[in-house]
């Protein structure tokens, strides 16, 4: 076992004083050249600006090397440190220990525990994440979908940037797009000076997230601010770049929207959607018994499944699913966040038509089935009441009870009459040791290399935790947890009582052999057809009423200084006045 645990140094948070100076200086919009950006990464030479094909070939070779493994037999030398109940390689902790924020050093920032993560996007995870050595090698895996060249500097006007709602049809009617476009039309490129930082929402591994307001509007965003020097010193610049590239390509109801991004001399900033409902981990803690009812779980995991399906279609393996990374929007629907551990790879979507000859005839001759192609199972009857989406979910999400349902024609093996799109990056391979201990797949722990099947393992752990309020393989410590994942069988507690279909789905997802795991071959299509999701109308899932809608968030404004009646108040200096207009100063830790 490891020796006495050492506290893990918190990731460097941007200095608000530095943010203030950047917001006042137009030069903050300057971007680094490719040569300068390459120089920020230790050991990275001008070869970074070579064509992507050469970089990909080199980086693909590096993924063939075995990643650092965890010694499960124990060691006298402390091989890991414990941070908030999780294992972190000592090498990473030592790197992060030396990263100290300037504001803390000079006393300009005070300690505070009042800044929680109850409301926000990309909130700080309550558990540490493991990142292996070969991570920097695998990121070069190219994808055929929207992968900008890494040989040029990334600016706010990148060809793949989220610069208008035209390229994001799912957000076409979002008023925040109009606010962004209005400022851009007036001032050109957006920068840090266009936003007021109101509150710190959380602190992740590579940056801090702030609630921000676009000046002159009532539009609120979540701004992720990353210190480029800190990222370079911890060799995490490539992770930040990967997250930005992924966010640029996303357009899905249950995934984040990147409204704009920009860089200053010191910081890299991503402006995303603000989720006032917090994360599912916080929401689960507020439930009676600290677990969700099965009907609520079905709602959340169905939306997560659609988001994962979309990511796999783009050749993105998420690798970091957990309740802390699932945020709740203001309407109660979810949003998956935090993509810095994701792996990009090649994928070839395949359209497979039904192999059941009776299914096509059934679709032509029977008009009682739902006309929506996205319905996995034709359980929605076409009748006047079905025009109201809530009747397809009953109550408001699931089908009507069996006694009230009209008998439907027999479908052989429940084969869908519609074509199936299979888009599973099954050939992807990575040797990185990344993830959260209780969610790590067996193949990651063994160092055997992993692919997209790890997402379906984490999906099973996620489902288990929402239903039972705990993860299935959690041990007394991190090392015991890893042993349990590899060697212990799956067990279900007696309470709370869940349906057989829920337990059966979890059994299929938590198969230790990845080739036998549910979803390994046909991806989300295979999982959506499981009986646990019977009655879910996938085409109308956004019309369903969420289990819980968060209360409207009151945006706190900076407190006004009281004016003394006995003596005239001193006029604030121009710098102080401009500072108060730019953001609200608050404590960091």
UniProtKB/Swiss-Prot annotation:
Amino acid composition bias (Low complexity), ranges on this chain: 142-165
InterPro entries referenced in this protein's UniProt entry, alphabetically: Kinase-like_dom_sf, Prot_kinase_dom, Ser/Thr_kinase_AS
Function summary: May play a role in the regulation of metabolism and signal transduction processes.
Keyword tags: ATP-binding, Kinase, Nucleotide-binding, Serine/threonine-protein kinase, Transferase
Comp. bias intervals (Polar residues): 15-36, 46-55, 63-76
Protein kinase domain span: 195-533
Sites where the protein binds ATP: 201-209, 224
UniProt lineage: Eukaryota, Viridiplantae, Streptophyta, Embryophyta, Tracheophyta
Single GO molecular function: ATP binding
Family recorded in the similarity comment: Belongs to the protein kinase superfamily. Ser/Thr protein kinase family.
Entry annotated with the keyword Transmembrane helix: no
Composition-biased stretches (Basic and acidic residues): 91-100
Catalytic residues (positions): 320 (proton acceptor)
Protein name as annotated: Protein kinase G11A
UniProt EC number: 2.7.11.1
Region described as Disordered: 1-167, 551-589
Keyword Translocase among UniProt keywords: no
Reaction it catalyzes: L-seryl-[protein] + ATP = O-phospho-L-seryl-[protein] + ADP + H(+); L-threonyl-[protein] + ATP = O-phospho-L-threonyl-[protein] + ADP + H(+)
């Amino acid at each position: 076992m490891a020796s006495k645990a050492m506290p893990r140094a918190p990731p460097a948070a941007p200095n608000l004083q530095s943010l203030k100076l950047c917001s006042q200086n137009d030069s903050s919009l300057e971007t680094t050249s490719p040569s300068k950006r390459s120089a920020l990464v230790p050991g990275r030479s001008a070869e970074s600006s070579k064509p992507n094909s050469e970089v990909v070939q080199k980086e693909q070779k590096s993924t063939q090397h075995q990643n650092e493994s965890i010694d499960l037999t124990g060691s006298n030398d402390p091989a890991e440190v414990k941070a908030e109940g999780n294992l972190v390689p000592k090498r990473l902790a030592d790197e992060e220990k030396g990263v100290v924020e300037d504001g803390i050093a000079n006393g300009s920032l005070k300690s505070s525990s009042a800044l929680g993560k109850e409301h926000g996007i990309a909130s700080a995870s309550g558990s540490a994440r493991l990142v292996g050595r070969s991570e920097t090698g695998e990121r070069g895996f190219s994808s055929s979908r929207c992968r900008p060249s890494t040989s040029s500097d990334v600016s706010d006007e990148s060809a793949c940037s989220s610069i208008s709602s035209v390229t994001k049809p799912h957000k076409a009617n979002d008023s925040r797009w109009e606010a962004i476009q209005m400022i851009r039309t007036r001032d050109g490129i957006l920068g840090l000076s266009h936003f007021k930082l109101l509150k710190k929402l959380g602190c992740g591994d590579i940056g801090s997230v702030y609630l921000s307001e676009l000046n002159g509007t009532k539009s609120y965003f979540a701004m992720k601010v990353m210190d480029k020097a800190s990222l370079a010193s911890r060799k995490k610049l490539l992770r930040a770049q990967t997250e930005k590239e992924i966010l640029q390509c996303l357009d899905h109801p249950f995934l984040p929207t990147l409204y704009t991004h920009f860089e200053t001399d010191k910081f890299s900033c991503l402006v995303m959607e603000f989720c006032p409902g917090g994360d599912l981990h916080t929401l689960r803690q507020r439930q009676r018994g600290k677990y969700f009812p099965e009907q609520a779980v079905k709602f959340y995991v169905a939306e997560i499944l659609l988001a994962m399906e979309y990511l796999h279609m783009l050749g993105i393996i998420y690798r970091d699913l957990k309740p802390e990374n699932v945020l709740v929007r203001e309407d109660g629907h979810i949003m998956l966040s935090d993509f810095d551990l994701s792996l990009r790879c090649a994928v070839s979507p395949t359209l497979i038509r039904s192999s059941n000859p009776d299914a096509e005839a059934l679709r032509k001759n029977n008009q009682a089935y739902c006309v929506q192609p996205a319905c996995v199972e034709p359980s929605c009857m076409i009748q006047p009441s079905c025009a109201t989406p809530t009747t397809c979910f009953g109550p408001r999400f699931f089908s009507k009870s069996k006694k009230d349902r009209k008998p439907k024609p027999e479908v052989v093996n429940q084969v869908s009459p519609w074509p199936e799109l299979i888009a599973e990056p099954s050939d992807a391979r990575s040797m990185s040791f990344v993830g959260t201990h209780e969610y790590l797949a067996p193949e990651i722990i063994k160092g055997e290399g992993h692919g997209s099947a790890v997402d379906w393992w984490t999906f099973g752990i996620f489902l288990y935790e929402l239903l039972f309020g705990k993860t299935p393989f959690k041990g007394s410590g991190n090392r015991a947890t890893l042993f349990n994942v590899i060697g212990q069988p799956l067990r279900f507690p007696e309470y709370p009582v869940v349906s057989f279909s829920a337990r059966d789905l979890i059994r299929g997802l938590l198969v230790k052999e990845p080739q036998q795991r549910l979803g390994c071959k046909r991806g989300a299509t295979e999982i959506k057809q499981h009986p646990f999701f019977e009655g879910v109308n996938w085409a109308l899932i956004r019309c369903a009423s969420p289990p819980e809608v968060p209360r409207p968030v009151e945006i706190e404004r900076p407190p006004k200084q009281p004016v003394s009646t006995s003596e005239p108040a001193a006029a604030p200096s121009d710098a102080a006045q401009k500072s108060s207009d730019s953001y609200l100063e608050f404590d960091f830790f």
